[in-house]
Amino acid sequence: MIRIQAVNKKNELEKNITHERLKAEWEGYKWFWVDFDQPTEEETAELDKTFHFHPLAIEDCVVKLQRPKMDYYEDYSFFVTHSLNHINEDKQEINFFIGSNYIVSYHHELSKEMNDVWERLSLSKKINKWDPYLVMYHIIDKIVDNYFPIVYQLEDRLSLIEDNPNDETMEELLEKLFDIRHHLLQIRYTVIPMRDLIYRVINSHRLKGVKERYEYFADIHDHLLKLTEMIDGNRELTTDIRDSYLSINSHQTNRVMRVLTVITTIFMPLTFIAGIYGMNFENMPELTWKYGYFETLFLMFIIALGMFWWFKKKGWFR
């Protein structure tokens, strides 16, 4: 679907303009916005037929999930941005062509950000303040704002792992921890390129519309910096929690091994004594002693008790 809104020379917004009318009255508009919303192949062909955009830029629109970037052409600029679905974190590409008096947006899937800004422009009572760069600002601002709920949700999940209110096992907690870390990494792969893109945008000498609204685009960059810090901070927190759990697990294992070591050590001399008297020699004087059995048991008991006292004194049972 191709939908069009245009502002005429009287600063009046005209809605639901047909593609044919736009081509016929091109010069009669102050500026216009053409949105290629889930376009067909025939509609995509209009990027070349009507607007004569560069083949490489058109190819970037058709081929999904290019890296966020900005390219300059003779009389327009091309942008690739990425939005994230806050429910399933699916990545969606939204492209822009911006000229002196138009913005052309292109996206393969339904875009909530695009629809929100489209509706905002439709209902605006200050049309004279709008232009293609303000449209782009609002769309990118919406895209970036929608990153935050995803990161906040992961932060909440991380807090639950820290508190462990359901007394889950360490294996379950570590599995959830690695899942959160994976999601943070995926979001980072989106946020970092977008941050670099906006940095290029606000420092560009060719985008006059951005210079006029520098504070707005700089604010988006600040949000992306904040997101980067939040993501990196949470990734470090996942590492700290993982290390803490592994340290606790290692400590518990060491305590078990210490107890087993004490038991084994205590039984070593007892096993040695039992082994001696278990040998099948005929001439063993102790075997003929009247109280040899009880004396041997007493000796083994004293040895075990003495070793137990020694280990306890050394703090092995703490």
Where do the PLM segments sit?
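Peripheral, non-transmembrane regulatory/ligand-interaction domains of membrane transport proteins
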Residues: M1-V210, Y216-D219, H223-M230, W316-R318
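Hydrophobic alpha-helical transmembrane segments and their immediately adjacent juxtamembrane loops
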Residues: H52, D222-R318
